[in-house]
């Protein structure tokens, strides 16, 4: 290898070292599977919602209840970007599981925050120039970590 070729190769290696790699695991799919596993491990019955079901990702029920639709929102690092419409009307009573994978910060296990949308409606943050979207910070949902009892 020539000196010029070695310099080019070292430039490529240095560039790769400089760039931080993001996880190649799609957060949405990972979150849904993790929530499903957590629910089954806690004694719930659960199934993935069909492709035509809008507004929810899983159906969950305990032994004596009817199926309850839940939304799963997953990120590698907070905040979660959400629609304002998720917190009003019929969706206000829906339960959302916010999943924080934490891959970029070397967190070894995901964190689950289980909350009814209406409880976060007043904490939803929306920049002045945004109309339909806003975000939920990790501090807003900390109180609801592992709040699986809400689904019983």
Task: State what each model feature region is.
Residues 1-54, 59-152:
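Mixed-charge (Asp/Glu-Lys/Arg
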């Amino acid at each position: 290898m020539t000196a010029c070729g070695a310099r080019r190769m070292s430039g490529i290696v240095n560039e790769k070292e400089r760039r931080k790699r993001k996880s190649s695991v799609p957060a949405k799919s990972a979150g849904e599977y993790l929530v499903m596993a957590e629910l089954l491990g806690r004694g719930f019955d659960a199934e993935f919602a069909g492709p035509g079901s809008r507004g929810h990702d899983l159906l969950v029920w305990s032994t004596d209840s009817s199926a309850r639709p839940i939304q799963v929102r997953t990120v590698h690092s907070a905040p979660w970007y959400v629609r304002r419409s998720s917190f009003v009307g019929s969706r206000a009573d829906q339960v959302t599981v916010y999943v924080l994978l934490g891959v970029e910060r070397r967190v070894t296990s995901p964190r689950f925050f289980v909350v009814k949308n209406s409880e976060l409606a007043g904490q939803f943050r929306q920049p002045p120039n945004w109309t339909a979207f806003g975000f939920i910070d990790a501090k807003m949902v900390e109180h609801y970590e592992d709040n699986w009892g809400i689904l019983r």
